[in-house]
Amino acid sequence: MRVIMGIASLGFLWAVFLLPLVFGVPTEETTFGESVASHLPKGCRRCCDPEDLMSSDDTVQAPVSPYVLPEVRPYINITILKGDKGDRGPTGTPGKPGKNGTRGDRGSQGVKGDKGQAGSPGSSCQTHYSAFSVGRKTGLHSSENFLSLLFDRVFVNTDGHFDMATGSFVAPLRGLYFFSLNVHSWNYKETYVHIVHNEQAVVILYAQPSERSIMQSQSVMLPLVPGDRVWVRLFKRERENGIYSDDVDTYITFSGHLIKAEDN
């Protein structure tokens, strides 16, 4: 009787200790897919068949969950990953020129600049000149030949370019010269005088016979070279002519001067 009571008391104590374990230990719960798969029939399979020969019919796909999971995309902050500045790259090929733009407006006038430095001295300027003016106080009549008109009075003769002995001007420089001749005609006689360049008559001074004597003039410009001669001649007697003058006044004058010198 005591043995039975002892065993009964031990059984009660074990029950007290085992109850918390039974109710406290979690048990595995089958998922919806596992539950469905466990209830679906499987095909016939021999125990000796390898597992990889299982028919596709033996595998049952679990249904898709009705809940859609959100797609998670990671965000990377690029500024955090920015590196150091790289080296300068090589120069590229020049591009094609663009089209010409429209002309801009005229800008305002700039301020006056500073005075520049003085230049180096230039070469000395050479002034070329030549002039003469002579007169005659004696009348002249024509003869059998041409007569060179000589002069007995000098008004101007720079550097002696007019030869008083021959009555001719000798050009000292190449250039353009101006000449003028003034005479007084004789009563009832023609006046027939030429201005001559070397041996060529260039212009004539002429007056018809008249009861009264008058003043006549002629002028001309000539290009000359050094050594050229210009002089005055009276026509020969085949045409009776003459020019008048006296000891009191000078009626006959011959003048000339250089207008512009030319480089040789």
UniProtKB/Swiss-Prot annotation:
Gene name of the encoded protein: C1qtnf6
Domain annotation Collagen-like: ranges: 83-124
Native organism: Mus musculus (Mouse)
SMART domains: C1Q
Main location: secreted
Localization in the cell: Secreted
InterPro entries: C1q_dom (IPR001073), Collagen (IPR008160), Collagen/C1q_domain (IPR050392), Tumour_necrosis_fac-like_dom (IPR008983)
Stretches for region Disordered: 81-125
Chain coiled-coil ranges: none
Annotated signal sequence range: 1-24
A GO cellular component entry from the record: collagen trimer
Record field: compositional bias (Low complexity): 90-100
The protein's name in its UniProt record: Complement C1q tumor necrosis factor-related protein 6
Keywords: Collagen, Glycoprotein, Secreted, Signal
